[in-house]
C-alpha cells in the first residue's frame, strides 16, 4: 500500500466474533513509518440474534514518516494454543 506522510487508512477484516475468533497484531509496523492508531470490532448490520459473520475487525493506520514497513495479523480461534486460522500481511511504502 502506498501512502503519503500523514495519510490514514482503515483495514477491515471479517471474523466470527460470536464463534470466538479474533484478529491480533503479531508484528506491528515500524512506528516511525506507520502506526496503528485505533482498532475496533464492528457488529453486523443484520437482524439481532444472527450468529456468525460478518463482524469486522477494523484497524486504523496512519503514515508517520517516509520509509517501508509491514503489518502482520493473525485470526485466532478461541481454543488456547490453537494455530491461527488465517494470516494477513500488508506492506507499506510511505512517501514524504
Residue ranges: model-predicted function:
Residues 1-96:
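Extracytoplasmic soluble-region selector
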